[in-house]
Amino acid sequence: MQSNLGTLLVNSPIEQRKAEHLKLCLQGDVNHQEITTGFEKYRFRHCALPELDFAEIDLRVEFLGWRLAAPLLISSMTGGTPQAGEINRRLARVAQQKGIVMGVGSQRVLLEHPEVATTFAIRREAPTIPLLANLGAVQLNYGCGVSECQKIVDLLEANALILHLNPLQEAVQTGGDRNFKGLLTKIGVLCRALPVPVIVKEVGNGISAEVAKQLVDVGVAAIDVAGAGGTSWAKVEAARAQDASQRYLGDAFAEWGIPTAHCLEQVHTALPDTPLIASGGLKDGIDVAKALALGAGLAGLARPFLQAAHQSEEALAQRIDLLLEELKTVLFCTGSATPQALYQRRCLERI
């Protein structure tokens, strides 16, 4: 069974692409260099007398009705290959242990190669936490309808479906799917038809307030701004490209996008009641705290957790523990007893 799967993965273009994406995200120099997340432009106002017991700081939050031990999401990144399957299982076990949310990488491959379903089959590893299914929104224009979306939700036993918007990646990717016409209407149909919430995210170029409002108006339950400042998928596709002109195209757009902090601030101002996820270049608990103070309900990290999980399950657990300790320290040193208090106390200042 395993050898047959390996042969399929080698011979399948979509699986070859998945393997290349995973390798580059683990080992490649694919981060934005010139554009930053924008979080460095903010600083917390220190509270010398917090009037708190550090041991009593409570990181628990609710998001979309889910009760979580901390406001943290292991963001969508991988799936569809044996290596990705093992990484997903490690991510799921640690997410379950920590009581946080986990998203998987795009499940489009399941619709073309159902035999790779085991690489996404992680509910056994994570029986009680929210799991997020994932599909490129553009696939709604390439044969994926409500039934296909329901199928990938069911296969993961997911609590929500993420639709990712990646126009730049598709534009610079060799053979990318570039027809984004009419997607908003189809997203609305999907939101009304599925029994689970639909979350829409970018992949590292950001969602503007205008686009976020359009999405919420058709029924999207939450927005993951997924801004610029972390992984540049234009760089990833440039590194993969075999054709020189395609490589140049990817490199030309390597620094394209809206910084994560700017997205978050603008979207929250326009849609103060919409649940928001902040992802895109967050690196530590201080960035997570800044995202929460700017209005996010959850903070998502992908590449840092992916790299730790590739090393070992223990390395991943330690990475998350450190991040949560950093977050607690920010709460303590701002006099905030809970993550919600970071926002309520208005203790983040632009510098």
UniProtKB/Swiss-Prot annotation:
Mg(2+) binds at residue 170. GO terms for cellular component: cytoplasm. It is an enzyme of class 5 (isomerase). Keywords: Cytoplasm, Flavoprotein, FMN, Isomerase, Isoprene biosynthesis, Magnesium, Metal-binding, NADP. Substrate binds at residues 17-18, 106-108, 169. GO terms for molecular function: FMN binding; isopentenyl-diphosphate delta-isomerase activity; magnesium ion binding; NADPH binding; oxidoreductase activity. FMN binds at residues 75-78, 106, 134, 201, 231, 281-283, 302-303. Its EC number is 5.3.3.2. Coiled coil: none annotated. It catalyses: isopentenyl diphosphate = dimethylallyl diphosphate. It is found in: Cytoplasm. Its cofactor is FMN; NADPH; Mg(2+). Pfam families: FMN_dh (PF01070). InterPro entries: Aldolase_TIM, FMN-dep_DH, IPdP_isomerase. Homooctamer. Dimer of tetramers. Involved in the biosynthesis of isoprenoids. Catalyzes the 1,3-allylic rearrangement of the homoallylic substrate isopentenyl (IPP) to its allylic isomer, dimethylallyl diphosphate (DMAPP). Belongs to the IPP isomerase type 2 family. This is Isopentenyl-diphosphate delta-isomerase. The lineage of its organism: Bacteria, Bacillati, Cyanobacteriota, Cyanophyceae, Acaryochloridales.
